[in-house]
A protein has these predicted regions:
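N-terminal capping segment at the start of a domain
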Residues: 3-19, 158
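N-terminal glycine-rich anion-binding loops that anchor highly charged ligand groups
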Residues: 5, 23, 27
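Active-site flanking loop/helix segments enriched in acidic
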Residues: 12-22, 91-97
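Cofactor-binding active-site loop characterized by glycine-rich and histidine/acidic residues
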Residues: 26-147
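Short internal beta-strands
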Residues: 50-52, 152-159
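Conserved thiamine diphosphate
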Residues: 122, 170-184
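Short gly/pro/ser/thr-enriched loop/turn and capping motifs at secondary-structure boundaries
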Residues: 134, 161-164
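Short, surface-exposed acidic-centric catalytic microdomains
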Residues: 165-169
């Protein structure tokens, strides 16, 4: 039910600006709903989420609005002159733990945050895109996390098989099955 409301809100905002990545935002709506409403339940200062697929930031903003971390007016000003919220998350804004945008950089930041927070037993959650798995820096972070025994990282890959020019499975068939890559 919440996911449906989130999608309606995304569409409502998309009528006013052209900078929304609808496909990527819609495909991770349920993922974001579960992370923010079942795992990040409290407002603990050290609870941490990184939207590695930064182009889908609008869903994060809408959830932060629902949680009264962002104001409705701030979300209404998404990608508008005078607004604080852009297409990609900026850690200078309330509820945003890392500035992301260029695919492939988010998981490295997650590894750094996890290392810093391991002693405090704080978990770092992140959503990656399947297209982002084409980036070498993502795989460096994927290998670094277990090497440093960072058991306080939860990564969810939005495996929607979509990217800018063609299906992810067509451009990089070696990625599939993705689940197997995380077990090797």
């Amino acid at each position: 039910k919440r996911s449906k409301q989130y999608r309606k809100r995304i569409l409502e905002i998309s009528r006013k600006v052209s900078a929304i990545h609808l496909g990527g935002s819609f495909s991770c709506t349920e993922i974001m709903e579960v992370i923010f409403n079942y795992f990040l339940k409290s407002k603990k200062e050290k609870e941490c989420f990184v939207m590695s697929k930064g182009h889908s930031s609008i869903i994060q903003y809408i959830i932060l609005e629902e949680k009264n971390i962002l104001k409705k007016k701030q979300v209404e000003m998404y990608c508008k002159k005078g607004g604080i919220l852009g297409v990609h998350p900026d850690r200078g804004n309330p509820g945003i733990n890392a500035s992301t945008g260029s695919l492939g950089h988010g998981l490295g930041m997650v590894a750094g945050l996890a290392l810093a927070e391991k002693r405090n037993r704080n978990t770092i959650y992140s959503v990656l895109s399947d297209g982002e798995l084409q980036e070498g820096s993502t795989w460096e972070a994927i290998m670094l996390i277990p090497a440093l025994k960072l058991n306080n990282v939860v990564v969810v890959v939005d495996n929607n098989n979509l990217q800018s020019f063609e299906k992810t499975s067509v451009s990089h068939p070696g990625l599939y099955p993705i689940e197997k890559k995380f077990r090797e």
